[in-house]
Amino acid sequence: VAETPVAVTGATFDLEQIQTGVQNSVDGCYDTANNKVVLVYSNAGTSEYLYYVVGTVTSESIVWGTPTAASSVITEAVCCCYNTTEGKIVAMGKQSSRPKVFVGTLSGTTITWGTTPVDILATNGIWSESKLVEWPGTSKVVWASYLSGTSSHAAVGTISGTGTGQTSSWGTAQAIVSDGYNSSRFHSMCYDAGEGDQVLLAYKIQASTNMGFWVRACTLSGTDISLSPTPLQVSSASTPAGYTPAIAYDPVNSKAMMVYTVDISGVGNYGYSRVVSSSGSTVSVGAETNFVGSGTSTQQCKQNWRSLAYATHTSNFVLCYENYDTSGSVGMVTTVEISGTTPVWSDDQATFNGGEIRDGNNVVIYDPDTTQAVLAIKGSANTLQSGVYRVAGDVPTSNMTATNLLGIAAGAISNTATGTINTWGSRNEVQTGLTIGSDYYVQEDGTITTASASPAQLIGEAITATQINIKDYTG
């Protein structure tokens, strides 16, 4: 089935206040089973408890449910991710000086959480600047966090249980500084889908030696994360800015984009970017490329930690950032794409907030179902606000019809490779989680679900949890 690219112009829309009170920390993820955006946060207006809110994205807007407490305990430095295999939200925050993990399942706009949070590491301290990412294809997640005054740590957690018994168990936490480098901060992490079973971990070091920005590949095995490869110094800046860097993965190019900010004395916070490549557990980077923004000083870019997301429909990245020049601070959004080993910045920047976006509390969550990005920020009034950004670029549109739909691939087929297609009268045996006896339809994006609304096309009936009889198969 062919796809024709259609040009779409990016746009931003009015911000909506989600929560009053001073916003302390926020993170978000997308629940692909329920097609919902989930934010977890800590806010002075809700006693600094761990709260969540669920949003439904429509065309150019988002409708939020009721903010609800996940835990009535003071919580700081939150982060979260979605685990597709388990269909669960995983949230972490510092409670009573420990990194605590909560596991929950979404239904409608309500999350049922396990009642007993788990310590990742039984060490008291000021845990902050944390990150959680999914280990795709497994029931696991990967965590990294900064512990003030000592080493940062990383670990692998396994998700299990149902209802109030949802929980996590954790492998041995590894010190990120075990290779002799100083304590890492502002961790940003993405899964390395091209290599598989490893994450790319970016961070900054702000100490007397080894200052600057770093990236490393961390291999995953069982419940272990390996930090043995030597990290690569991306920038040796003597004054790396706070609330940066950001890293996200492009599965089309099998590379990652890394954006970081350097505090240049007398000038301001200047943004830079590099493309990160991996071969096994060895990483390399392309040439450093200046960030391109707007205003009197186009390289001004700050508050961009956690605010870089990959947009699958356009194969580019969305970046939310704060720009500062002689006219003052404003919240802006733009896009960047990978060309070879070079970042290519868009010349289209949009203002979505007429004041500061503060303290790194700015998150971008991409919604693949509406092909829009959700921005959650700490605005100039210090409150939690959100907006929706329609990502500019070429959006593929399908020409699929009942007559040109041939069948289902019998397995994964790489680009330019050949493979077997199960056509009419045959059986496809590589599905998962099917409901026996239900009709299944191919959607416009190539996914297979029970949704029958046009332009979806009937492909066949599930005869087992893993098999579909394609149209008139009678075997």
Regions inferred by a protein language model and the residue ranges of each:
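Beta-strand initiation motifs
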Residues: 5-15, 58-66, 108-116, 161-172, ...
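Short loop/turn motifs that cap or connect beta-strands within the blades
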Residues: 12-21, 66-73, 116-124, 171-181, ...
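Conserved core beta-strand positions within WD40 beta-propeller blades
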Residues: 36, 88, 140, 198-200, ...
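Extracellular receptor-binding modules and their adjoining Ser/Thr/Gly/Asp/Asn-rich linkers
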Residues: 1-20, 24-28, 32-34, 41-43, ...
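Extracellular carbohydrate recognition
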Residues: 268
